[in-house]
C-alpha cells in the first residue's frame, strides 16, 4: 500500500512540527501512545490506518475484517527505542526499516526524520480493529 509510513519519506513540511512549540514524545510515553492503538494519517490521496499491536505486530486496518476485497492485514512490525530526545519508533515493512521521532502538536502528531516532517497531522485512535474516523 502506497500510504504506509515507510513509503512516506518525502518531506511533507519544514521544521515547524519537529520542534517547539510541539513536544517530542519520548521514552515510555512513546510506547504508551502507540501500543494497542491505531495511527490515522493521510498525505495527498493516500490514507492509512495502522494498528500498533502490543508485542510489535503492525496491521493495516484497510476496510476492516469483514471487507472481502481489502481486509485488514499485517504489514510489518514496529518497535520503540526509549532514549530521551533520541527516542524513536521504528517500522519494518519487510523491505528495510525506517525510524521516526514523534512530535505532539496538541493532539495531532508529526513523524519526523532529522528534523524534517515526513508525515504530519496524524491522529491516534484508542484501540485496534476500530478504523479511523
What would you call each of these model-derived segments?
Residues 2-10:
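Bacterial N-terminal signal peptides
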Residues 13-75, 81-133:
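Lipid interaction determinants
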Amino acid at each position: 500500500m502506497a500510504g504506509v509510513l515507510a513509503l512516506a519519506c518525502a518531506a511533507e513540511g519544514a521544521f515547524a512540527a519537529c520542534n517547539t512549540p510541539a513536544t517530542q514524545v519520548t521514552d515510555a510515553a512513546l510506547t504508551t501512545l502507540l501500543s494497542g492503538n491505531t495511527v490515522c494519517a493521510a498525505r495527498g490521496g493516500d490514507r492509512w490506518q495502522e494498528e500498533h499491536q502490543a508485542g510489535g505486530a503492525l496491521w493495516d486496518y484497510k476496510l476492516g475484517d469483514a471487507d472481502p476485497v481489502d481486509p485488514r492485514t499485517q504489514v510489518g512490525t514496529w518497535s520503540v527505542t526509549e532514549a530521551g530526545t533520541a527516542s524513536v519508533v521504528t517500522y519494518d515493512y519487510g523491505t528495510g526499516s525506517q525510524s521516526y521521532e514523534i512530535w505532539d502538536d496538541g493532539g495531532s502528531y508529526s513523524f519526523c526524520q532529522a528534523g524534517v516532517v515526513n508525515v504530519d497531522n496524524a491522529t491516534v485512535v484508542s484501540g485496534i480493529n476500530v478504523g479511523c474516523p
